Design a protein with these regions (language model features):
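Noncatalytic alpha-helical scaffold of FAD-dependent oxidoreductases
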Residues: 1-469
């Protein structure tokens, strides 16, 4: 056990807990909680998040030693340690001809961290939906001593535990649904309108697409499951993607944003250069794990992601575009020009493709894609906006993100990702999550003294009675 300064991947969250510990096993974790039951407790996973969810001035626990993977006798689920990274789980499953039903854009996250914040891919539910049971260490409500509970379902407790934000206790093991390994057919194309891209969703249900800033064209990354064998040129495609996109594109953006810092060059790049260098209509088949992930962890960045319902997608994306334009110094004809404070006009130049992914509604209480209305269950679309500015130069991004999150929540009941930059307060979230009170009741059952909460979570999700002092 030590004390050390901790920071997240984006370097926007820094703090020093009173104590930092990496228990080796469940017995060690129980002893740790028993010995330090006077401290507030949070868990850190991979650190690949941008919200304040991990912050604590008490005990910070890293469960990286909880990494066992074992497939159930029935072969339809896997029991995996909370600290196991998604990429390690995927590799272990692949050896047995198995796969997770979906995958997020990156695979550096841990299983517990990814599920607890509603990490998602495109065209399916979030990872949280596929959680069948959760093993969690918390304090007994009657005796106050640490205990282990296994949460199963169907139950309101499991719906809460699937995406719990770490508020039920320290997750030590998750049981997740698995399926036979599968391949993905992928190709990319450029479009003039949103309708053209969305029209292909039925044929390519796993697709994700991008709105290119400043050119305002659309780029579709069309994907579907296939029984076709891996393409002969799949290896070359992976090299192209790794060298050209994971490294090449991001190095160019790094230079434009962090070194040159000339707005006109950023706009020229997106209008004239990028459309010429992105491979189009190259149809490739490869394993799902290779196709559905990128190496976004190579370059430090910060991200906000908002979720809108299908019925609001078109109007929401138009307002995202106009918000980018106003913050970039352009005039727009809508009322948005007046709604954004004049002091913010021209303060932030967006410089990265806006990624849009469809996510099916989850059977959870507070994941971003939990139903907003039980009588009108719609698909959700995640709209991701990434900034590569130096940490010391992000004031423009924060102004942009703060306005966007608040405006989209008011206009479209848009939710902000719990694991990314999230400025929404408790009042806003109360309106956005109809089952929030049910979630709080489950939290009270497992953590009546709010030992596993922190100031941010108290301010954005817990009730006045549950808040950390």
């Amino acid at each position: 056990m030590t004390t050390k300064q901790v920071h997240n991947f984006g370097n926007n969250v820094r703090f020093t807990p009173a104590m930092y510990a990496e228990p080796a096993d469940e017995a060690g974790l129980l002893k740790l909680l028993e010995d330090h039951n006077d401290l507030s407790i949070r868990v850190i996973a991979s650190g690949h998040a941008w919200s304040d969810a991990i912050k604590t001035d008490g005990l910070l626990i890293n469960v990286k030693h909880f990494n066992e993977v074992r497939i159930s006798p029935q072969g339809d689920s896997v029991y995996v340690g909370a600290g196991c990274q998604i990429k390690c789980l995927a590799a272990a499953l692949a050896e047995q001809g198995k796969s997770l039903p979906t995958s997020g854009l990156i695979d550096e996250q841990t299983v517990a961290g990814a599920t607890a914040t509603g990490t998602h891919g495109s065209g399916k539910n979030s990872l949280s939906q596929y959680v069948r049971s959760v093993r969690v260490v918390h304090f007994d409500k009657e005796t106050g001593t640490p205990k282990v509970s296994t949460i199963t379902g169907p139950s309101v407790e499991l719906s809460a535990a699937r995406c719990s934000l770490g508020l039920l206790g320290v997750i030590v093991e998750v049981e997740m649904e698995i399926r036979p390994a599968y391949n993905i057919l992928e190709y990319s194309a450029r479009y003039q309108t949103l309708d053209q891209v969305v029209a292909l969703e039925h044929e390519y249900p796993l697709q994700q697409f991008y709105l290119m800033p400043w050119s305002w064209h659309w780029f579709g990354q069309h994907r579907k499951e296939t029984t076709q064998a891996r393409s002969k040129l799949a290896g070359l495609y992976r090299v192209y993607w790794h060298v050209g996109i994971d490294w090449g594109l991001h190095l160019v953006i790094f230079a434009l944003v962090k070194l040159m810092r000339v707005k006109s060059l950023i706009r020229f790049f997106f209008k004239r250069v990028l459309p010429l260098v992105v491979a189009k209509n190259w149809r490739v088949v490869d394993s799902s794990q290779k196709m559905l992930t990128m190496e976004h962890e190579i370059f430090r960045h910060i991200e906000i992601e908002v979720f809108v319902r299908r019925s609001d997608l078109k109007n929401a994306l138009e307002e995202v575009k106009q918000t980018i334009q106003v913050f970039g110094g352009e005039a727009v004809s809508s009322d948005l020009q007046q709604q954004i404070p004049k002091s913010d006009h021209g303060t932030y130049q967006h410089h990265y493709p806006i990624c849009i992914r469809r996510v099916l509604a989850d059977e959870t209480l507070v994941s971003m894609t939990s139903p907003s209305n039980e009588k009108d269950i719609q698909d959700w679309y995640a709209i991701s906006l990434i900034c590569f500015e130096w940490p010391s130069c992000r004031h423009g991004f924060f102004g942009f993100a703060n306005f966007l999150a608040s405006h989209m929540a008011t206009r479209f009941h848009a939710r902000s990702h719990w694991g990314k930059y999230n400025p929404l307060d408790r009042q806003a979230n109360q309106q956005l999550y109809p089952r929030l009170d049910e979630f709080r009741s489950v939290v009270q059952k497992f953590d009546p003294e709010s030992r596993f909460a922190n100031e941010w979570l108290s301010n954005v999700i817990l009730s006045d009675a549950d808040r950390v002092a």
